[in-house]
């Protein structure tokens, strides 16, 4: 089974968010199952020279972009056992950053068409193209419109994974005519038309053979008016074509037993004393009073309403009257950045506000915190709660998307569960569940049980890769 994984970013070459982590970890896990999966992505100008100098030029050809033919080179690099192809075009991709340009519609029209054209030139007989988010969602449309008579393309099946429905690749309808060379019939409610524009993501949902979202709960949520981002009607109508497969994390990268970025290594059998040492060292590093009686609450997050920061804002004064310390790492909306800076100055023994991003500090927070706070308004899957559990930090989450699927609330009567959760987007519920978690923390035996259950959960890519493999196999039957 040969799969071409088309994506706009992949760790370690280019990363803005969780999509890059998926593009790194999922193909690696699928190759262990015997799937010959290869990643294809743009060769951005910001890719570190450590990698570009090792790339091998395979071939070059031209790609039709409207009435023009644009150069396309294919570079190759095998990284940690996964083959990567890079689409090389300096006009479109040799720029600072990856997204946010006025011509993103043209850039990713070109990239999508280049992926289709590359099928002619790669020494790789593709069975499935797996596309991701709006950047590559138009590939299934192009296969139908321009390549249905090509023997190399006719048999290809397509899978679309929606990592976040909010970003839909909406562009003026002229993009459809002038850049994608699609006829009038594609400007239709049942194809690309989205109000008076076109949506790449909508086209992918309609034309892909299978649509996957990154958790089962999110797959159900996006069929509703409140979470459907204007596409709920379409998503409700595609039935079993839409499935949810929860993301995993790379257990080789996220491993408290070997992580060189944390203070002291530990595992599920040694966490009790060694995790405490990480807590004390983190408190010391951040100039917080060193104490195990104080519950250390950590957050590594974008500071936006989507992440539930407005709920925290409404309870923060009351929260700081409790025996807790709050450590924040992240950046985002100016208002929330200033709010946390204010509380860090007003309560220097209770709040540490780190308005930036540091992978090293993030790992130290995962390892040193007692509780990880994630009260998101929406969360398609979420990776942070999985990392927190891997490091024995107990998550408090809102029951939405992948948070609901991955965190089982603790039941003190049965002793089962590895986190705490609340249902409604309400500050009173958040405050109540934090107080409940603090009451459980005071019972060390119960808390040890919760931490052990969290650390021994299998949130690696193994199970998820198996589900993707079954999706592929069903398409090729």
UniProtKB/Swiss-Prot annotation:
Keyword Nucleotidyltransferase: no
Catalytic activity reported: [(1->4)-alpha-D-glucosyl](n) + ADP-alpha-D-glucose = [(1->4)-alpha-D-glucosyl](n+1) + ADP + H(+)
Domain of life assignment: Bacteria
One GO-annotated biological process of the protein: glycogen biosynthetic process
Signal sequence interval, chain numbering: none
Keyword Membrane: no
InterPro entries the record matches: Glyco_trans_1, GS/SS, Starch_synth_cat_dom
Pathway stated in the Swiss-Prot or TrEMBL entry: Glycan biosynthesis; glycogen biosynthesis
One Pfam family recorded for the sequence: Glycos_transf_1
EC annotation from Swiss-Prot or TrEMBL: 2.4.1.21
Record-level Gene Ontology MF annotations: alpha-1,4-glucan glucosyltransferase (ADP-glucose donor) activity; alpha-1,4-glucan glucosyltransferase (UDP-glucose donor) activity
Binding site for ADP-alpha-D-glucose: 15
Enzyme class: transferase
The family this protein is said to belong to: Belongs to the glycosyltransferase 1 family. Bacterial/plant glycogen synthase subfamily.
UniProt cross-references to PANTHER family, sorted A to Z: ALPHA AMYLASE DOMAIN-CONTAINING PROTEIN, GRANULE-BOUND STARCH SYNTHASE 1, CHLOROPLASTIC/AMYLOPLASTIC
Its biological purpose: Synthesizes alpha-1,4-glucan chains using ADP-glucose.
Protein name, per record: Glycogen synthase
Source organism: Caldicellulosiruptor saccharolyticus (strain ATCC 43494 / DSM 8903 / Tp8T 6331)
